[in-house]
Structures are given as C-alpha cells and as structure tokens.
C-alpha cells in the first residue's frame, strides 16, 4: 500500500484514540500476547478537532460503521467500526439480499458484478459482528461493505481472524477495527463495473482500554493458506 492509502488508516486510528481515551482510561486491561510486532503508544494529548481523512473524500457514516468509498475501485478503501463487548451476540436473522448503498454519491457497485466471478462477496465489517440487532446486521449487506475475496481465504484465515477479533472484543471490553483491501493501480477486475480484486487485505485492531493504546495489524494475501493469521502480523508502518 502506498503512502496515500496509508494516511487515512493512520488518521482514523488517531481519531479512535481521541474518542475512546476518556472512555477507557480507568478500566482494567490485559495486554495482547507478547510480540515485538505489536505497536504500543501512550499519549493523552490529541486534538479533539481531528477528523478522519479520505483519499477520495467519499466518507459515508452509517449507523454501525463508517467507510471511505473508492469509486475507481468500486469498493471501500477502508471500513471502520467499534466492536464492543455488548455487540457480541448469537442472534440468528434471515440473510438479506445485498443492496447498493444509496449514501455513496457515485453509487456503490451492483452485487451482480460478483456473480460467476469466482470470488466471494467478502464482508469488510462482518455480519457476525452485527448480530445484536437486525438493523445492524442488515446494514452489513450494503455493497459498499464488500470486496472480492478468494473463497478459501474468506472462509479460512480471514474468517478465523474475524472470530479472534470477537474474542478480543470480549476479553478487552471492546476494540476498534479498521479494515479493507489494499487498493492500487493495475489490479484485476470483475464485472461490468470493473470492481478491483485486492491482492491483500489488512485489518488493524485497536485496544485503548486503559489509555495505553495497543494496535495490532494484519496484512494477509487474498488467497488460500493453511498458515495461522498470526503469521501475517505486521507493524502498522508496514501497511504501505
């Protein structure tokens, strides 16, 4: 990922730190597993006027996640959301159809671009993270929240990482997530609208439960693998 795609990710992380510092500062916390790849920062001085930025200017705030839409790639360059302990639920809802996101001014890609493409309609904010209400669950089926994912990747290492994030949300009383595909020029595309197929996906998890901000980042190739997601832990600075 080049620097122009890195900046909005890093900025949204700072914004999250700003937002949750006071909320979590007095709560008890446990550390992430000991690893040199975990970035830990501790600072209480941030501008409360700092806002997320976007390389496209197409930021859309929904009820249960926020995204920055990239029209050239017909998908979000990042999706950001909080996963609190109270969000965790085993509720079962009827699976809705994917629908276009009317809040995206240029129009999000039609789900039919994925039909017979060989790729899954991979959620960025997982439906499994939004089972606490039907409205929240339904919102994850907006096509602005999906990206073409290799089927084995989606059901394998990416799914296992999503499950682990839920575990961390329960253990650390909530986390904040920024995730998306690595978007760049020259990617293969699918469908009539030329939806880009990312070669890699990233997921950045922030825990600010005691004011000592812990960030764990993953960068995983969009292909089948038998390796653990822990093999793809990277410093946040490497996601460029």
Give the positions of each predicted feature.
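Domain-level detector for secreted/extracellular nuclease and nuclease-toxin modules, and
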Residues: 2-240
């Amino acid at each position: 990922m080049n620097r122009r795609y890195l900046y909005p990710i890093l900025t949204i992380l700072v914004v999250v730190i700003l937002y949750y510092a006071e909320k979590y500062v007095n709560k008890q916390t446990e550390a992430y597993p000991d690893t040199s790849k975990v970035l830990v920062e501790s600072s209480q001085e941030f501008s409360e006027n700092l806002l997320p930025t976007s390389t496209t200017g197409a930021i859309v705030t929904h009820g249960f996640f926020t995204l920055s839409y990239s029209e050239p790639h017909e998908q979000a360059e990042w999706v950001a959301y909080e996963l609190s302990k109270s969000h965790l639920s085993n509720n079962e809802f009827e699976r809705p159809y994917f629908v276009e996101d009317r809040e995206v001014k240029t129009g999000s890609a039609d789900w039919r671009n994925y039909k017979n493409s060989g790729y899954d309609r991979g959620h960025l904010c997982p439906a499994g993270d939004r089972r606490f209400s039907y409205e929240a669950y339904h919102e994850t089926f907006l096509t602005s929240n999906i990206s073409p994912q290799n089927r084995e990747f989606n059901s394998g290492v990416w799914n296992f990482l999503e499950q682990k994030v839920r575990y961390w949300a329960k253990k650390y009383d909530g986390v904040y997530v920024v995730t998306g595909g690595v978007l760049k020029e020259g990617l293969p595309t699918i469908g009539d609208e030329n939806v880009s197929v990312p070669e890699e996906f990233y997921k950045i998890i922030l825990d600010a439960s005691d004011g000592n901000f812990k960030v764990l980042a993953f960068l995983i190739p969009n292909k089948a693998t038998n390796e653990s997601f822990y093999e793809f832990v990277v410093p946040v600075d490497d996601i460029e």
